[in-house]
Amino acid sequence: MALREIIILPDKRLREISKPVAEVTPEIRKLADDMFESMYEAPGIGLAAIQIAEPVRLITMDIVRKEGNGKSDPRAFINPEIVGASAELNVYEEGCLSIPEYYAEVERPKTVRIRYTDLDGQVKEEDADGLFATCIQHEIDHLNGVLFVDHISKLKKAMVVRKFEKAAKRGIKYV
């Protein structure tokens, strides 16, 4: 495993649309391992490959760690897609490792049904709700070049983007 640098707004690579993974290879498994290590170090509960400048449709998550009970449930999702979503919405305060120290309430479907391939190459479908639903939608957005600030008001988004652009010009690195 290797710790990888997480790219930060306004890095334009965050807006790239990630390419599908054709096959689960040892390289994809190693990338997932690197992503878990980088995600835990940050610390975070979800990471899309594009956030470490790898434009492939791979997500790692461990939402159990957020509960602070010392347990862990690392999961990888290859080529994840939402195949169904509830009409009922939920509001959750989101943050992002690529937009450090900024949080905002985002409204998303309360439950979603996802289809993905696991690291063993098995295609699966699963229902997600609560934090899992919020996190998987947030990470799938990354694979499509969408950031959580795209879901907030234009004024708030403009303010946060400007803040990160100014910091980048001054060479400030968020850690």
From Swiss-Prot:
Binding site for Fe cation: 96, 138, 142
Record protein name field: Peptide deformylase
Cofactor needs: Fe(2+)
NCBIfam families in alphabetical order: pept_deformyl, PRK00150.1-3
Enzyme type, top EC level: hydrolase
Task performed by this protein: Removes the formyl group from the N-terminal Met of newly synthesized proteins. Requires at least a dipeptide for an efficient rate of reaction. N-terminal L-methionine is a prerequisite for activity but the enzyme has broad specificity at other positions.
UniProt cross-references to InterPro entries, sorted A to Z: Peptide_deformylase, Peptide_deformylase_sf
Keywords: Hydrolase, Iron, Metal-binding, Protein biosynthesis
Active site per the UniProt annotation: 139
Keyword flag DNA-binding: no
BP GO annotations: co-translational protein modification; translation
Gene3D superfamilies per the UniProt record, alphabetical: Peptide deformylase
Family membership noted in the UniProt record: Belongs to the polypeptide deformylase family.
Single GO MF descriptor: peptide deformylase activity
Cofactor: binding comment: Binds 1 Fe(2+) ion.
Superkingdom classification of source: Bacteria
Entry's EC annotation: 3.5.1.88
Catalytic reaction equation(s): N-terminal N-formyl-L-methionyl-[peptide] + H2O = N-terminal L-methionyl-[peptide] + formate
